[in-house]
Amino acid sequence: MAAKIVVGALVAIGVAVLAGAVWLWPSHQKVDIPLPFQNAAGGAVTTEAGHVLSSKTAPCGSPSNGAVLTAEPEQAPPGGGQCVQTLISIDSGPNKDANTMLEFSGGPGQPHLAVGDHIRISRQIDAGGATSYAFYDFERTWPLIAFAAVFAVVIVAVARWRGLRALIGIVVAFVVLVVFLLPALRDGASAIPVALAASAAILYAVIYLAHGVSLRTSAALLGTLAALLLAALLSWGAIELAHLTGLSEDQNNEVAAYLGNVSITGLLLAGFIIGSLGVLNDVTVTQASTVFELAETGAGRKAIFVGAMRVGRDHIASTVYTLVLAYAGSALPLLLLFSVANRSLGDVLTSESVAIEIARSAVGGIALALSVPMTTAIAAVLATPLLSSHSPNRR
């Protein structure tokens, strides 16, 4: 009976998630490119591959800065400051195999390029049809591919087919975020239903793909969904009660300036909810597995619950400080600035930038802690009747 109730609840929630996704499905209409991301013609910035040929110190202000070179770079007029002039080979695009020269002042925030470095350079065409180049970013494609490949190989080597299914689940999660969540938020949809629908869809895919379809995983999924709803309510309460606006972050200010129909507090709320997914999933799956393993010993439901909660408390203790330290690590530059600002500890902790991280940690920690008894109770109810049907001598 308990199994039928849990399966029925998961089916009903799944149908509700599907209906919500259809109702909230984004328009995917093309939007204007924000000004900072436009090229001179109003389109997207075009980048090309390049690599550094040489670098030298020379007077700033060369007329050849950024131009496609047909000869040696022109020298700057005398009397200016000193810059680093870097000769770049253009490796893609209409000027492939040509060279350009880029100047850098060498101050804070300026890139430090060495001979052989592979970079991305933006290509601009002015009203007169002349092409110019500027430094855009370092080329990171192959290092990232290498790390991703090693990550995938290690996961599959250790976890085998379950690891492969987990990797597929990660791909599904990113597809949901890119195809549904981000466009829906960009359309101005309400953050809570969008984030809940996206998160629930990710959980169904990730848990069942990685761990298979069983009563054990169904218990973990139902516990995670319950904790996720709790996290959404806590996130809303934290943002409202603490008057968090999200405008202390530069990216949110850019969103407010260039995507006026997007709610910044809604975006903050969605971030809180999505951020709680991973840690909740980890804890609930572990708890459900613990309960079903304890049930194999023939213990009673109460003993199983108590034993699993001992394991769960250890998991909570280790995961909570991991959660807090992860958020503290992401805010480390901000904390460093506050450390030299000669402000009181109370002012620092209640400033919006730090308060957001505190609220995020608190929401995740509360949802994490409460997910343990919820999942343990659900799994204990499911595991003990299942065991008794195979163990007629069990009391």
PLM regions: where:
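Extended, hydrophilic extramembrane loops/domains of integral membrane proteins
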Residues: 105-140
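Structural detector for short beta-strands of small beta-barrel domains
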Residues: 43-82, 119
